[in-house]
């Protein structure tokens, strides 16, 4: 049974995922285009958000929030970066989203919540991203 604190953690995680999936990434490159200084990259802030949420909260909370996010995007609302529906299941982007499940488990295994410092956060984040990309190669 979920208590109120776990429910709040899940809702905060879900809210963070939905908001960051809609935020585009811009890189200022003033020497390429004279008219506009920003170039939009076709990525979102989902992976850094998943990493940060997994480092802060427990694995179960982030897995539940991410599962709700997937269900919302496939069946209810277009919360993914490029929309969403049942047809999104057949796109490569959905496979990339499914690759975030091992990322959550790997980060939680690497994370030691007794001592928290920036160096461990960065090291565990980069190790988890590398492991996620290696797991996507073998899927």
Go through the PLM ranges and name each one.
Residues 21-40, 68-103:
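Interfacial aromatic-anchored transmembrane helix boundaries in multi-pass membrane proteins
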Residues 3-23, 85-134:
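Short helix-perturbing small/polar motifs within transmembrane alpha-helices
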Residues 137-139:
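Conserved small/polar residues in nucleotide/adenosyl-binding loops
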Residues 62-66, 121:
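Alpha-helical transmembrane segments and their helix-entry boundary regions
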Residues 71-76, 129-135:
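Membrane-embedded alpha-helical segments of transport systems
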Residues 1-63:
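Hydrophobic transmembrane alpha-helices
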């Amino acid at each position: 049974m979920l208590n109120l604190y776990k429910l709040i953690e899940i809702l905060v995680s879900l809210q963070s995922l939905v908001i960051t999936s809609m935020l585009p990434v811009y890189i200022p490159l003033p020497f390429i285009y004279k008219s506009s200084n920003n170039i939009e990259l076709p990525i979102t802030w989902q992976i850094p958000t998943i990493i940060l949420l997994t480092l802060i909260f427990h694995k179960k909370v982030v897995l539940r929030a991410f599962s709700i996010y997937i269900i919302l995007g496939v069946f209810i609302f277009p919360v993914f970066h490029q929309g969403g529906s049942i047809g999104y299941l057949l796109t490569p982007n959905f496979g990339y989203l499914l690759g975030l499940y091992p990322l959550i488990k790997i980060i939680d295994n690497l994370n030691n919540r007794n001592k928290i410092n920036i160096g461990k956060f960065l090291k565990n984040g980069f190790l988890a991203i590398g492991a996620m990309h290696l797991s996507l190669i073998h899927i």
